């Protein structure tokens, strides 16, 4: 993987390169850029495809608190670093959250959105608490300690 300094963070990414129309894919929570390997293989002959690891996942470390707005600025900064003026942004789950925010931040740079299993609204109050518990447990005890909380969020009560 390549890396670039974007907004004070070392962002890990892969880029098929070239001058073809650009597609930038942002992964979901608890995943990394490799979730899009099949899509990269399918698109690489007709598009420049960029996948990246968002803060706190894969090869990109989280260096402090950040928001989806920060992540949106990361993808726009990555576009600047790669000399990509505009692109189709695709995102799954949290990747969709940040892709939507990038489109709101810089609408002239986003040609289209590909949104998978994501939403544009605010989380319902009853779903916020499990995420707060997840965050607190992760910060205090690490990723292994949160597997039951994650299972509950994904699968319902266990």
Question: Where do the protein language model's features map onto the residues?
Answer:
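Conserved HGGG/HGGXW glycine-rich cap/lid loop of the alpha/beta-hydrolase fold
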Residues: 5-64
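Conserved acidic catalytic loop of the alpha/beta-hydrolase fold
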Residues: 69-87
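Short beta-strand immediately N-terminal to the catalytic nucleophile in serine-hydrolase-like folds
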Residues: 89-91, 116
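Flexible "cap/lid" loop of the alpha/beta hydrolase fold
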Residues: 100-105, 110-141
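Helix-loop "lid/cap" segments that line or gate small-molecule binding pockets
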Residues: 118, 133-137, 148-158
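Gly/Ala-rich beta-loop-alpha elbow adjacent to hydrolase catalytic centers
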Residues: 91, 95, 99
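Structural signature of beta-strand start/N-cap positions in the alpha/beta core
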Residues: 22, 46-48, 85-88, 109-112
């Amino acid at each position: 993987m390549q890396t670039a300094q974007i907004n004070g963070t070392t962002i890990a990414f892969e880029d098929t390169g070239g001058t073809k129309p650009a597609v930038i894919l942002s992964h979901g929570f608890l995943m990394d850029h490799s979730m899009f390997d099949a899509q990269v293989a399918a698109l690489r002959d007709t598009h420049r495809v960029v996948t990246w690891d968002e803060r706190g996942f894969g090869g990109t470390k989280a260096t402090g608190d950040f928001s989806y707005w920060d992540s949106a600025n990361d993808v726009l900064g990555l576009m600047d670093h790669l000399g990509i003026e505009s692109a189709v942004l695709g995102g799954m789950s949290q990747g969709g959250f940040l892709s939507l925010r990038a489109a709101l931040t810089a609408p002239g740079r986003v040609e289209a959105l590909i949104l998978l299993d994501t939403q544009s609204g605010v989380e319902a109050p009853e779903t916020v608490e499990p995420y707060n518990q997840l965050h607190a447990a992760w910060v205090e005890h690490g990723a292994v300690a949160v597997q039951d909380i994650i299972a509950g969020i994904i699968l319902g009560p266990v």
